[in-house]
A protein has these predicted regions:
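Class I SAM-dependent transferase core
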Residues: 2-44
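Short loop/edge segments at beta-strand edges and connector loops
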Residues: 23, 102-103, 172
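Conserved SAM/SAH cofactor-binding pocket of Class I
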Residues: 40-122, 128-130
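Active-site-adjacent beta-strand anchor residues
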Residues: 52, 75, 170-173, 194
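Conserved Class I SAM-dependent methyltransferase catalytic core
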Residues: 148-192
């Protein structure tokens, strides 16, 4: 059987249910943003969730560890990242609960179906435009810059996938807050103020 962890990779402890994540230091590794998002998002019993721009799959795996949802899916454009995520799912024996799909966020509603899920999460590329980009096909560039999808693409496809009264959770940079609110209004996603936590 093929080894799940390759020689250039490492195994990181997620500090939940004994789950571990396979990461490649040459690709984008998760940070505190993903952890905070997975802690803030809530998936109720019987609900299904999709994580866009899932990278190495850390968010759907953490969501499974913290919630009682029916199923968690991750969508990732880059084949090498999707492969990492699938191997982490297999390593943690989560094949029945977590699925990783390889595909384009711009077509997410076609892949998963319209009004098909209760929850969408996303830790998207934060940076706009081509400033500082040396190679638009570089894995790190795709993870950090809007070269393959835009904020508009992400919010549009999320709105299409969400059922009535579904929930959209996104972590992003404050400098784009006005644009985020405007884009959410464009696609009829209402901002819900929660204090101190959506779990209360």
């Amino acid at each position: 059987m093929e080894a799940l962890i390759h020689s250039n990779e490492r195994l990181d402890d997620l500090c939940r249910k004994g789950y571990r994540l396979i990461q490649d230091p040459k690709l984008f590794c998760f940070g505190i943003d993903a952890v905070l998002l997975s802690d803030y998002a809530k998936v109720k019993r019987g609900e299904r969730a999709v994580d866009l721009c899932t990278g190495n799959g850390v968010i759907p795996i953490l969501l499974e560890a913290k919630n009682n949802g029916e199923h968690y899916s991750g969508l990732e454009l880059q084949p090498q990242c999707a492969d990492l995520a699938r191997r982490s799912v297999k390593y943690n024996h989560l094949e029945d609960k977590v699925t990783i799909e390889e595909g384009d966020v711009c077509n997410a509603s076609e892949l998963f179906g319209r009004e098909s899920v209760e929850v969408v999460t996303v830790n998207p590329p934060y940076m706009i435009g081509q400033h500082g980009i040396k190679n638009a096909d570089d894995a790190m560039t795709i993870a950090r810059h809007e070269v393959r999808c835009t904020l508009d693409d992400i919010v549009r496809e999320s709105a299409k996938m969400l059922k009535f009264n579904g929930r959209f959770y996104m972590v992003h940079r404050p400098f784009r807050l006005a644009e985020i609110f405007s884009t959410m209004m464009k696609y009829h996603i209402c901002l819900l103020y929660t204090s101190p936590s959506p779990r209360d």
